Amino acid sequence: MTSFRHPGTVLTDRFFAVPLDHQRPDGEQIEVFAREVVAAGQADADLPWLLFLQGGPGFGAQRPVGREAWLNRALKDYRVLLLDQRGTGRSSPANRKTLARLGEQLGAQAQADYLTHFRADSIVLDAELIRRELTGDPWSVLGQSFGGMCAVTYLSFAPHGIREAFITGGLPALTATADDIYRRTYRTVAAKNAAHYERYPQDVDQARLVADYLDGHEVRLPDGAPLTVPAFQSAGGVLGGADGSHALHYLLEDPFAGEELSDSFLYAMMNQLSFARGPLYALLHEPSYAQGCATRWAAQRIRAEFAEFDPAVSGLDGVQGVEGSAPLYFTGEMIYPWMIDADPVLRPFRKAADILAERDDWPPLYDPARLAANDVPAAAAVYYHDMYVDREFSMQTARAIRGLQTWVTSEYEHDGLRVSDGAVLDRLIGMVRGNI
């Protein structure tokens, strides 16, 4: 356990041993890392704990410097624990290097079986072991995006461990399949494309120029991954953030150096497309929705139902660029099989990814009956235009969780917790406490 100071905070690094498979508590153990953050001058105070569950899946918690964003509001009332969910950050990593030997010795099936232990149900059981080690009392839980899904899993299977729950952009569909979810999200992504091109009509021509170039040339990113038209389309994953449309515009405003794509553009695309920071995001994205059925590469299959995402088809009826270009529709956070083939950090998992996609015995992630009887104070922010978590599914879930209060807002996008300077968290705290 190591402690150090940042401006206005004291941070303590903690490691916890947890079983890889919670059904076999005496079996293989892995390590989970968490960072405690407390306001300077409050290190010895008797403050309630707030567990932060990061969005993802597959990303470690934020690395704070000072008291930025929502953390400043949280530190007024809580001792915060930033959890690197299993397999991420400084927790025992699950990536191509750590799982290479497993694949070499036992094959892709063993890799796939190993990866089944990195979903929300296992994360919640990790959290319970950590809670019992740190404090005997229930703690508060803040879940952002995928972390909100974990929070609902927590309310389903270990509500005794939660004092109060705050969920931001992360109320999951309780019974919908991955197919159902992608049918909703493709429509939302299409609307985000339309809004982007209305804001930046010049980008119609720019995007089409890049797509036409890629259609006629073999292009490699700095990490060796191929940049194809579908890969370029996946740059639309940023459109769900507050500044996402502007970020996409800046990417498109100067992509060429003479007659070739510029190094700076290719580097920017690599940063957007590479899963080096979070390989589990790609491998477990669709399995994170699965309950009792196979996902079978749902995003790829359902995409065929939406012709506007075909690069050969105009996305907007009657809308053209300045030079007569047909709009190219960008995709969202969907994961496609070609991504596993293309990305060097994912390629070793190609067979394992297919095995995960065909697995049909996934255990439940939520307990509707338990949620209907919920007695944990809880509040959720539902973002009206959320591109990543469907609003209608979120509201169905909100109605299914007894006592859950919701705040539906168009003031923020999916990243409202991060960009609101504490306002989103402050409102949810006020709702739970009866002040709003």
Residue ranges and their predicted role:
Residues 2-30, 35-224, 338, 343-354, ...:
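Gly/Pro-rich cap/lid or specificity-loop segments adjacent to the active site
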Residues 39, 399-402:
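Charged, amphipathic alpha-helical interaction segments
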Residues 218-359:
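Alpha/beta-hydrolase fold active-site neighborhood
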Residues 251-253, 390-399:
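Short alpha-helix in the alpha/beta-hydrolase fold that links the catalytic acid
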Residues 374-375, 379-382:
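Short beta-strand/loop motif that positions the catalytic acidic residue
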